[in-house]
């Protein structure tokens, strides 16, 4: 299929920031893909990109295990922008000198622009940038000039404009680099000559055509959880092929208040999709009876879900494709190319060997924030598009220890109150994740004139970018007070509320 947008390729040399580069470029309205540094020049040529960016990385270009690229990439005649390690690699390739710095430079630095190449067009002569390197370019390759310097880095930026080659020692993709976005924009638009054309409207049009071509008159099966990824996949595919899609929604009894009903109302009634709801509460609760260990609970819930899905799928005839909500981050973090990832996932989720499906993964070029934008474009309600991250085992790991119907009801009701009050306070887009948990401990209290001995409910709320690290959310005291008063008064068998003020690390976001 012919691409309808310009593309910038990012080569991954191991930087923790490499995904940020691709995301920044997409935010400009230009499509960008991240590829391993081992990609060949021929493969890049076939993609017809407008330019290439070499990411940073933790290695030394002269050290053992140094990562290199196909040297023929430099013969493609494409603009290349090397960031940190990428600049050092370019320097080495063209005969310059890279040496170990006297001390590793990490943190903010003041950059002074000495030569206004296209990269620095309309940018201030002095700007704050983010450094993170242990090596330095100490000798320029022939044909290159110094673009910028810093106190500890005499060659903080370089260029050979005749060949459209540029390098910087700092990280423009990181927020701490105050004009970093403008610098990347200058490369994308000023050097590479890209035009804006990457947007969700364009993506939907291209992806619908691709799904129709792939599926033809065959049938597709989708496991619908009500989460944003599976919801967007289901709606997108349904828009493409209509009733050729069948969704299976497993209600394991561990969902939040009103969730099962909400899923059916939204997708079965709202989008008129063919959704098979499986009520498996009793089946799951029987398996979980007496189980206290969190890992064992996770395993039981995960395995049982597969068995239930298998049972229902086997009742359906002629299902050729399985739809999955695989995101671009899943593919990138697996360290493999898209095709290899699909191959390794032919038994998705541990499905039995005799259940062979061809995969459809329409979101596998999108980041999470882009999936939310896509969901909104497709008309999916905000409460699903902006749904809180929810673990696969559901409330099963928010009830610490053995799961009972009574404990599930306490978590379900208290969590509903928390969500309602957070939304009322206008904090639902500011806090990355918030929920209640039942630690299983009881304490003495007084309600009316009587002594009580009831459960404690814990509130967990965190701010984060990606969930890898998190800080506890500073919810205003008056909001916390409302939440506490409501839970104690409206939820049976609760007489105490505690607020978790631990960051990640050392704690995890979930309690189990």
Swiss-Prot record:
It catalyses: XMP + L-glutamine + ATP + H2O = GMP + L-glutamate + AMP + diphosphate + 2 H(+). Pfam families: GATase, GMP_synt_C, NAD_synthase. GO terms for cellular component: cytosol. GO terms for molecular function: ATP binding; GMP synthase activity. Residues 198-387 form the GMPS ATP-PPase domain. InterPro entries: Class_I_gatase-like (IPR029062), GATASE (IPR017926), GMP_synth_C (IPR001674), GMP_synth_GATase (IPR004739), GMP_synthase (IPR022955), GMPS_ATP_PPase_dom (IPR025777), NAD/GMP_synthase (IPR022310), Rossmann-like_a/b/a_fold (IPR014729). Residues 7-197 form the Glutamine amidotransferase type-1 domain. Its EC number is 6.3.5.2. ATP binds at residues 225-231. The active site is at residues 84, 171, 173. SUPFAM superfamilies: Adenine nucleotide alpha hydrolases-like, Class I glutamine amidotransferase-like, GMP synthetase C-terminal dimerisation domain. Pathway: Purine metabolism; GMP biosynthesis; GMP from XMP (L-Gln route): step 1/1. Keywords: ATP-binding, Glutamine amidotransferase, GMP biosynthesis, Ligase, Nucleotide-binding, Purine biosynthesis. PANTHER family: GMP SYNTHASE [GLUTAMINE-HYDROLYZING], GMP SYNTHASE-RELATED. Homodimer. Catalyzes the synthesis of GMP from XMP. This is GMP synthase [glutamine-hydrolyzing].
């Amino acid at each position: 299929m012919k691409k309808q947008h310009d593309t910038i390729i990012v080569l991954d040399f191991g930087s923790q920031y490499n995904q940020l580069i691709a995301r920044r470029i997409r935010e400009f309205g230009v499509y960008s893909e991240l590829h391993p540094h081992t990609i060949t020049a021929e493969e890049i040529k076939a993609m017809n990109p407008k330019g290439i960016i070499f990411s940073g990385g933790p290695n030394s270009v002269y050290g053992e295990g140094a990562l290199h690229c196909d040297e023929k990439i430099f013969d493609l005649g494409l603009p290349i922008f090397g960031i940190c390690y990428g600049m050092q690699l370019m320097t080495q390739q063209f005969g310059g000198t890279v040496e170990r710095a006297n001390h590793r430079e990490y943190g903010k630095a003041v950059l002074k622009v000495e030569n206004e190449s296209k990269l620095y067009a309309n940018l201030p002569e002095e700007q704050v940038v983010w450094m993170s390197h242990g090596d330095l370019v100490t000798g320029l390759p022939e044909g290159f000039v110094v673009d910028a310097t810093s106190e500890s880095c005499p060659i903080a930026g370089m260029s050979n404009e005749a060949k459209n080659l540029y390098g910087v020692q700092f990280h423009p993709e990181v927020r701490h680099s105050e004009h970093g976005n403008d610098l990347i924009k200058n490369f994308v638009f000023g050097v590479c000559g890209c035009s804006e054309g990457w947007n969700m409207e364009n993506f939907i049009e291209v992806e619908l055509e691709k799904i129709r071509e792939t599926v033809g008159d065959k049938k597709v099966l989708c496991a619908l959880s009500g989460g944003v990824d599976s919801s967007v996949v289901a709606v997108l595919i349904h828009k493409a092929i209509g009733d050729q899609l069948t969704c299976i929604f497993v209600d394991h009894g561990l969902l939040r208040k009103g969730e099962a009903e909400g899923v059916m109302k939204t997708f079965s009634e709202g989008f008129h999709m063919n959704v098979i709801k499986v009520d498996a509460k009793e089946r799951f609760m029987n398996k979980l009876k007496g189980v206290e260990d969190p890992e064992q609970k996770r395993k039981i819930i995960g395995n049982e879900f597969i068995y239930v899905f298998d049972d229902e799928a086997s009742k359906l005839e002629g299902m050729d494709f399985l739809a999955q909500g695989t995101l671009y981050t899943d593919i990138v973090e697996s360290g493999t190319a898209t095709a290899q990832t699909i191959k390794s996932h032919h038994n998705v989720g541990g499905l039995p060997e005799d259940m062979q499906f061809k995969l459809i993964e329409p979101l596998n070029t999108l980041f999470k924030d882009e999936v939310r934008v896509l969901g909104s474009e497709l008309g999916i309600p905000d409460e699903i598009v902006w749904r809180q991250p929810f673990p696969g085992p559901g409330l099963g790991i928010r009830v610490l220890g053995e799961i009972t119907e009574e404990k599930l009801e306490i978590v379900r009701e208290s969590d509903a109150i928390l969500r309602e009050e957070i939304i009322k306070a206008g904090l639902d887009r500011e806090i990355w994740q918030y929920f209640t948990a039942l630690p299983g401990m009881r304490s003495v209290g007084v309600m009316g004139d009587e002594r009580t001995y009831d459960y404690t409910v814990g509130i967990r709320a965190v701010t984060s970018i990606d969930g890898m690290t998190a800080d506890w959310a500073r919810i205003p005291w008056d909001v916390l007070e409302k939440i506490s008063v409501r839970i104690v008064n409206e939820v049976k068998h609760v007489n105490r509320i505690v607020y978790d003020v631990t960051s990640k690390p050392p704690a995890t976001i979930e309690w189990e």
